[in-house]
Amino acid sequence: MSIRKQARLEAKQFIDSLTVQPFPNSQKVYVQGSRADIQVPMREISLADSLVGGSKKAPILEPNEPIRVYDTSGFYTDPNQPVNIYDGLEKVRSGWIEERGDTVLLEQSNSVYTKERLSDETLDELRFDARIQARQAVEGHCVTQLHYARKGIVTPEMEYIAIRENMGRAKYADEELNQQHPGINFGANLPPEITPEFVRKEVAEGRAIIPANINHPESEPMIIGRNFLVKVNANIGNSAVSSSIEEEVEKLVWSIRWGGDTVMDLSTGRNIHETREWIIRNSPVPIGTVPMYQALEKVNGVAENLNWDVFRDTLLEQAEQGVDYFTIHAGVLLRYVPMTAKRVTGIVSRGGSIMAKWCLAHHEESFLYMHFREICEICAQYDISLSLGDGLRPGSVADANDEAQFSELRTLGELTKIAWEYDVQVMIEGPGHVPMHMIKENMDEQLKHCHEAPFYTLGPLTTDIAPGYDHITSGIGAAIIGWYGCAMLCYVTPKEHLGLPNKDDVKVGLITYKLCAHAADLAKGHPGAQVRDNALSKARFEFRWEDQFNLGLDPDTARAYHDETLPQESGKVAHFCSMCGPKFCSMKISQEVRDYAKGLEENGDIAIKLLDNPLEGMQQKSDEFRSRGSELYHPVQEEI
C-alpha cells in the first residue's frame, strides 16, 4: 500500500472511531451567562492537595483550587456530548441568529458553481449529507457584529466572549495564584475584567473582530483584538499532490484539540468545495479561506484567466457554506510590483504572486482592488470578516521592511476604512521574515496606517538558516510581535518551506505558538495570564508531578519525557527527577532550607542564640547531619 493510501486509511479510521477524549484530570465545565442558552465552555484542571505538615500516617493536606483554561476543543473533549463527524456539531448560535429577525433562508444557492456541484451525482459519495440551509441578510439589512456594536447592541456573542476571555479568574482566592508582574503593554488597554460592554466597544471601534458567519452556527464565539488574549491560527488544507477529505477533517479535530483558535482551509487540490463543507460543519472555531485559491482552480490554474465574475461566484459559494473570514490580497497594486524586482526572494505570497501576475498580464489594477466595495457588500450580507492579505510580505530577512511591504500596508489601511463604511469587520495580515530588531517597526506602522485594526502575522521568522525548525525561528518573532500588540499569530510548522504538514507537524506548530501567545500575554500583563504559571510552579516545587503534566500545554509529551527515565509509579511522587537525581535537586534543598528557616522564625530564642553565636549553631547542625549518616535525602519510600 502506498504512503498516500495508508495516510488516508488511517485518517478514515480516526474519523469512524472518533470518541470523546478529555485531557487528563480535566473536565469540561460550562459557565452560564445572563440567559440559559449562553453556555461558555472552559477546561477545568483538577489538582492534588499540597502536603503542608504532619507525618506519614497523619499528613496535613491543603487543597489546591482547580485551574480553568481557555478551551477551543468544542464537544470533542466533552464526554457528555455525542460526537458524530457525519452529523456535524450542535448549532449553538442558531437561536441567536434567528431571533434577530434580520436574515432569510435561501430557497436556492446564489452561486452558479454550488448549483453545479449539487447537481453532479458523481460527487454523492464525497458530499456531507447534513448540510444546512443557507441564509443571508434581509434586503436592506446588515448582519455584522460590527453593525450591532455600532448601534449599541450587546449581542449574545459578545457576552459569551466576555465570559470566555475572563476564564473564571474572579473565583481564585489564593494570593499566590493571583500574583502577577505588571507587564509592559505598549499602549494597549487591558482592563482588570472583560465585560460585554467592553467587547462591544472594542468591536465598534474596529480594534477587535468577532469572525462569525451566520451560516456557521456551530462556531463558539471568539474575539481577535489587541486588548484580548493573543490568538493562534492553524492552517490545514489539501494540495494537488497530497491529502484527502478524511485527512483534513482529522487535522481540524487535532488542531482545535491543541489550541487552534481559528483554522484556515488553504486547500488547492481536488474537491475543495466538498472538503470545506465537512470542515465547517464539524468546526467549533471560525474557519478562514483564501478564495483566490479556489477561483484559480476554476480557471485551470491560469492566473491571467481570472476575472471578477469567477471570483464573485466563489465568494458567494463560500459565504453560503459558512466561511467566517476571507483573506483578500486587494492591496497588491500594479505600481508596487516593480518594487519587488530587487528583492532576494521576490513575491512569496501565493495570493500576492497570483494578483501580481494578473496585474502585469492585463496592465491594470487588480479586480480585487477595483471591486473592493462589492466584496464588502457581500461580506455584510453574511457577516464575513475580511483579513486583508499582505501579498507583498517579505520572504527573507533581507527583504524585511522594504518599500513594497510598507506601500501595500498603507493601501490596506485605506481599504480598512472602506470596509468599515459597510460595517464589515477587518483585520490586517503581516509578515513574514523579519529580524528581531526590525519587528517593532512593523507593529508601529500597522497601528499608524491601519487605524488599530487587529494585526495577524505569520511569525515573523527571525532568521532563514533553519529549514525543519521554522516553528522555532518564527516562534521567536511571534512572541515578540504578540507582546507589541499583534492580535493573532498564524502558526508555522516544522514543515514550513519543505512540505504539507501532517498531523504530528500540526501539533508541534500549535503547541509552539500557544506557548508564544501565552508568553506575549504575560509580557503585556494581561489580567490573569499568570495564574496557570503560578499553579504549575507551585506544583513543581511541591513535586506534584501529575499536576505538572496536566497543567502544561502538552500533558502527553511532558509525561512521556518524564517516564523515559523514571517510568515507575514511585517516580510520580519522587522528590527529584532524572536531571539532577536525588542528591542534587535544588528544589528539594530549597524546601529543607525553607522548613529550617520557618522553624527558626517560630522559635525566637533559637533564632537569637544562633545570631549571637553563628559558628556554634553551624557546628551543631553539622554534627546532626553527620549523626544521620551524612544522607542528604531519605529514601523515596520513606517520604510522606
Swiss-Prot record:
Pfam families xref list: ThiC-associated, ThiC_Rad_SAM
GO CC annotations on file: cytosol
GO biological process, one term: thiamine diphosphate biosynthetic process
Residues annotated as binding [4Fe-4S] cluster: 577, 580, 585
Cofactor: [4Fe-4S] cluster
Self-association state and partner proteins as the record states: Homodimer.
Function as written in the Swiss-Prot or TrEMBL entry: Catalyzes the synthesis of the hydroxymethylpyrimidine phosphate (HMP-P) moiety of thiamine from aminoimidazole ribotide (AIR) in a radical S-adenosyl-L-methionine (SAM)-dependent reaction.
Family, as annotated: Belongs to the ThiC family.
Protein name: Phosphomethylpyrimidine synthase
Protein's organism: Photobacterium profundum (strain SS9)
Classification of source organism: Bacteria, Pseudomonadati, Pseudomonadota, Gammaproteobacteria, Vibrionales
Chain's gene name: thiC
